[in-house]
């Protein structure tokens, strides 16, 4: 079997790896394509240290995001019930619907936190009453927010 070269990718390469990955490739592929195009660099001890430092920074950033999301979850728990006002008709049927934007606005007003409306999951809401919404703050952190729908 022929000798393989270790290179560190400087950008994503389809079917080979992502930016910063250490991969083994055929010497001709590295010498004739990856290195001249600037797509990869030879894996020297200095470059390997740089790659490891980048990975550590990325890991620290992801950990900080997770801790921030956990703190926001605790803050949302302490807020209490949110209030959403809607126009109602007979038998407390609401006109229109309660949207995720309504819940996001209520969270912003009450807790002072910006929440992406696309991360909010609502139950079917047809009448006034108490409901719960799931708010996805991070891929690993979901908070539950209670709210009341009351007449305008």
UniProtKB/Swiss-Prot annotation:
GO terms of biological process kind: translation
Keywords attached to this entry: Ribonucleoprotein, Ribosomal protein, RNA-binding, rRNA-binding
UniProt superkingdom: Bacteria
InterPro entries: Ribosomal_bL9, Ribosomal_bL9/RNase_H1_N, Ribosomal_bL9_bac/chp, Ribosomal_bL9_C, Ribosomal_bL9_C_sf, Ribosomal_bL9_N, Ribosomal_bL9_N_sf
Molecular functions (GO terms): rRNA binding; structural constituent of ribosome
Pfam family, one: Ribosomal_L9_C
Gene Ontology CC: ribonucleoprotein complex; ribosome
Protein purpose: Binds to the 23S rRNA.
UniProt record similarity statement: Belongs to the bacterial ribosomal protein bL9 family.
NCBIfam families found in the cross-reference section: L9 (TIGR00158)
Name of protein: Large ribosomal subunit protein bL9
Native organism: Picosynechococcus sp. (strain ATCC 27264 / PCC 7002 / PR-6)
Annotated gene: rplI
């Amino acid at each position: 079997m022929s000798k393989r070269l270790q290179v560190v990718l400087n950008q994503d390469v389809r079917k080979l790896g992502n930016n910063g990955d250490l991969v083994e490739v055929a010497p001709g592929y590295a010498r004739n394509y990856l290195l001249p195009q600037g797509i990869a660099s030879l894996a020297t001890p200095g470059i390997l240290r740089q790659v490891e430092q980048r990975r550590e920074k990325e890991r620290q950033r992801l950990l900080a995001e997770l801790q921030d999301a956990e703190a926001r979850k605790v803050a949302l728990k302490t807020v209490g019930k949110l209030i959403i006002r809607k126009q109602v008709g007979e038998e407390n049927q609401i006109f229109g619907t309660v949207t995720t934007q309504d819940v996001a606005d209520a969270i912003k007003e009450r807790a002072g936190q910006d929440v992406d409306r696309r991360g909010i999951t609502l139950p079917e809401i047809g009448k006034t009453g108490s409901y719960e919404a799931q708010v996805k703050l991070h891929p690993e952190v979901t908070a539950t927010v209670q709210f009341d729908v009351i007449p305008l």
